[in-house]
Amino acid sequence: MQTRVSSPFISRALSSSSNLNELRRIHALVISLGLDSSDFFSGKLIDKYSHFREPASSLSVFRRVSPAKNVYLWNSIIRAFSKNGLFPEALEFYGKLRESKVSPDKYTFPSVIKACAGLFDAEMGDLVYEQILDMGFESDLFVGNALVDMYSRMGLLTRARQVFDEMPVRDLVSWNSLISGYSSHGYYEEALEIYHELKNSWIVPDSFTVSSVLPAFGNLLVVKQGQGLHGFALKSGVNSVVVVNNGLVAMYLKFRRPTDARRVFDEMDVRDSVSYNTMICGYLKLEMVEESVRMFLENLDQFKPDLLTVSSVLRACGHLRDLSLAKYIYNYMLKAGFVLESTVRNILIDVYAKCGDMITARDVFNSMECKDTVSWNSIISGYIQSGDLMEAMKLFKMMMIMEEQADHITYLMLISVSTRLADLKFGKGLHSNGIKSGICIDLSVSNALIDMYAKCGEVGDSLKIFSSMGTGDTVTWNTVISACVRFGDFATGLQVTTQMRKSEVVPDMATFLVTLPMCASLAAKRLGKEIHCCLLRFGYESELQIGNALIEMYSKCGCLENSSRVFERMSRRDVVTWTGMIYAYGMYGEGEKALETFADMEKSGIVPDSVVFIAIIYACSHSGLVDEGLACFEKMKTHYKIDPMIEHYACVVDLLSRSQKISKAEEFIQAMPIKPDASIWASVLRACRTSGDMETAERVSRRIIELNPDDPGYSILASNAYAALRKWDKVSLIRKSLKDKHITKNPGYSWIEVGKNVHVFSSGDDSAPQSEAIYKSLEILYSLMAKEGYIPDPREVSQNLEEEEEKRRLICGHSERLAIAFGLLNTEPGTPLQVMKNLRVCGDCHEVTKLISKIVGREILVRDANRFHLFKDGTCSCKDRW
């Protein structure tokens, strides 16, 4: 009778027990009353001991009633183990349950499934799921929730979604488990999709829902939706939960809205370490280094930072170049008891290096018993930053001797060293090691090698690497095209550009900034226009650098109007923009427009630099505006206080020389405060040849050879002057000197774009397409020109030939004439022609082209090394000032 009376009291006492000692006293009472064999009280004791983290006591209770014939007891002990993280034991007792004569019920499986999830044992989880299906418990809400949670935790989201979809009834736990699974495994779009489905149901999200879905909003950068979720959190009151506020802070930092993140942080009633860590690390990711460090230092008494936060702040000291602060953080870590693993020491090396203390950085490195790849990379990077490239190379060699594992970062750093030092031997050694270790498979390493070989003058090796690669990425193509442009191999550069356009690689702004100058150099107008259309499609036209490149491209492709149109449409202009437009007008002999543009530039508030004055004096020179050009030179010195460089003096000499003021040019040279170089005298020499002042030409030629005997361009210019004077001994001496020094002159060639093809011609070329027809066409033109009084100028023949016919043959075979004849043969009558030449047009070709334009009734635009010439009706736009 006493037992029956005492049972309800003991049951209530067990349920309300608040600590372990109280529970033990009640347990003793249960034993004294003989109730310890009761399944009911044993089950409650097992549950209560597990609640107080005493699974051993739970097991002891279970053993007193073994063999258990009631599933309630089995469920209690399995739940006790699972609840306390003893997942193997939980599954062990589930196995024993299966071996007994007792059948599991629907309450058994949530704890068993939790154990499978805790062990990440998908195979066991699938087996349990099959048993659930066999027993018909799959429709139970709690079993379904446990299965969704298990598969979600394991990242088996397809299975989780399948279980979720098949559940006849779902509660908030079901939705939360699935949302959390998708979000925690980076499937943010799916997480948002499930969240929106939840909002459309009758179930109201809670704090767990919000905290689970916040990372999805942040990572997908859906700002408006994220702000809407913040509003829901405020309205529903879940923002009072610290984990929700932490998620909101993280979300706004992902949105790059640190002000909003800080507002949420400041309004939090309760903050934990995660709150501070999130804010500090978020500032660092946004490169708000000072704010991050300030928050860390000001709140050290409010929270305990984790290792990630302290390490991040320590790294920030390197960015701030604050060595004393770094030492303070380091001492804090020691006092706080942080274990200084290699990661922290690697950061220390990096910080000391950035602060310029390589001695301490090396001491930290040398003191490390276990150095990993990051350690080596950190110290090597430090020496590279400090400019001690040789020590960086020594460390790499030491690394190889010690058989330490180098990674792609190591190779990228050392390849940059070999590039900076132009050390091809070391670079080839890196390449060889990279092939052996398999590092060269890394795309960034291959790109760096392409760049290294190109900058060391081995473009062929760059192209070999490129051809052995797969598709590569945008950087790959940009690097190869840039290499071709740098070394003047425009034909290959064009081929690579065409290949890139046919590939699936998406160009970036750097692509356009390297291909547009190439089109400008080649005067590849059609390709330039296609690239312009392409950059419009990708939205780059409004970029300032792109606008500047387009102005240059169109101006050098013979499309001055297009250059002007691009210039007018630009919403922003810098000094480069104005310089490009002024130079463009100069190339076409539009000196007045160049001066107007210069005046507009001054009115706009842009202060001209030294390069602008080179462009404006150049424009005046090619337009015969001597007084205006001299005025600009004086303005540069007196008004803008720019000290003239040799280039400015060369422009003024050219200005005077082109206007046949040769004596004034020489006077100007004599008055120069700096010693004139060959470029100064070259302008005078060209003017002498044009005017026929061969006495001055001979004197100037001697000066040029004395000043720069190794430059093929200046040497050939002097040689041609001596040839015009018929001083063949001087010509022979110059050519022998160049030959002995293995110096070769740039061969002259011209090209013309007809249809979609570019046709290139060299002087005397008889292997070109339609060669026979070209020469026949020229013969007809020469006979017509003779009637106009044309006589070939023998001064343009630089070889010692006695036969006049031989001289005539050489002159008549100049490359620009072949290109013009080809254009006449392959275009409709009256169609304007555009021919490009890599060298300066000779006087005889200039005269011939004027006559051809008159005879055939066509405009012929020729770009040579100096400027554009528009030939029309027997005249040239340069007015014979070229």
UniProtKB/Swiss-Prot annotation:
Domain of life: Eukaryota
Gene Ontology MF annotations: RNA binding; zinc ion binding
Claim: GTP-binding is one of the keywords in the record: no
Keyword check for Protein biosynthesis: no
Keywords of this entry: Repeat
Pfam families in alphabetical order: DYW_deaminase, E_motif, PPR, PPR_2
Membrane-crossing segments per the record: none
Gene3D superfamilies: Tetratricopeptide repeat domain (1.25.40.10)
Region Type DYW motif, residue ranges: 787-882
Entry-linked PROSITE patterns: PPR
GO BP terms: RNA modification
Type E(+) motif, as annotated region: 756-786
PPR repeat locations: 3-37, 38-68, 70-104, 105-139, 140-170, 171-205, 206-240, 241-271, 272-307, 309-340, 341-371, 372-406, 407-441, 442-472, 473-507, 508-542, 543-573, 574-608, 609-639, 645-675
Region (Type E motif): 680-755
Cystine residue pairs: none
Recorded family membership: Belongs to the PPR family. PCMP-H subfamily.
UniProt protein name: Pentatricopeptide repeat-containing protein At3g03580
Lineage: Eukaryota, Viridiplantae, Streptophyta, Embryophyta, Tracheophyta
